[in-house]
């Protein structure tokens, strides 16, 4: 799963 916020990229 890609978050719009940087550093909050979780699958």
UniProtKB/Swiss-Prot annotation:
Its main location: nucleus. It comes from Gallus gallus (Chicken). One of its GO terms (molecular function) is DNA binding. Keywords: Chromosome, DNA-binding, Nucleus. It is found in: Nucleus; Chromosome. Belongs to the histone H1/H5 family. It comes from the Eukaryota. GO terms for cellular component: chromosome; nucleus. This is Histone H1.A2. The keyword Amino-acid biosynthesis does not apply. Histones H1 are necessary for the condensation of nucleosome chains into higher-order structures. The keyword NADP does not apply.
